[in-house]
């Protein structure tokens, strides 16, 4: 598995040994970033990226390679965080990224929550959010609602949700669906955060 675009194009990413983590395939990542850049005014350049259910970090790392300013990776699985640390170090992106151990569906206490998230309270809201949860469990909608309630999202931020095509994803309140595209058994949805919670 490799970075498919930007200044780190072609660089290898560490991959999971188990089936518990399902990284976004290179072909799908390339299609996704083409849609963002050509269909949504390139929201990647200069973005503050939040990668929820980060796994290997492929989506957030791809965004950093393509000009994002900062990425915060959130995953509660030990294997995922180990892969994230390995990939961030191998790509030399430690200065523009952070990794948090957190349940992505429980961000509603807020990024400003009295030190509860450690250094997260000092982070500005995010302009581009990737969600690639385990398919078919309704976790993406829960995570979106939680991130919105917790103040993690900038007004007008773009959300990219990767879900099983058969899951019939419905965006929670506060999000406008901009686009829905099918790729084999996967569906990509692009949503816009409509403002404050």
Which residue ranges define each predicted feature?
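Class I S-adenosyl-L-methionine-dependent methyltransferase catalytic core
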Residues: 1-197
């Amino acid at each position: 598995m490799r970075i498919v675009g930007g200044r780190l194009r072609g660089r290898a990413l560490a991959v999971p040994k188990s089936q518990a983590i399902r990284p976004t395939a290179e072909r799908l990542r390339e299609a996704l970033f083409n849609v963002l850049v050509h269909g949504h005014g390139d929201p990647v350049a200069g973005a503050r990226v939040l990668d929820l259910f980060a796994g290997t970090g492929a989506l957030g790392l791809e965004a950093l390679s393509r000009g994002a300013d900062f990425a915060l990776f959130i995953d509660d699985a030990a294997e995922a965080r180990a892969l994230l640390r390995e990939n961030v170090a191998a790509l030399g992106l430690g200065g523009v990224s952070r990794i948090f151990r957190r349940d992505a569906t429980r961000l509603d206490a807020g990024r400003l929550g009295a030190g509860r998230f450690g250094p997260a309270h000092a982070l500005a809201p995010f302009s581009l959010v990737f969600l690639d949860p385990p398919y078919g469990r309704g976790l993406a909608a829960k995570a979106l609602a939680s991130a919105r309630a917790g103040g993690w999202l900038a007004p007008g931020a773009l959300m990219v949700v990767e879900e099983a095509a058969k899951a019939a994803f419905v965006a929670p309140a506060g999000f406008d669906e901009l686009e829905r595209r099918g790729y084999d058994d996967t569906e990509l949805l692009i949503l816009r955060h409509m403002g404050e919670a």
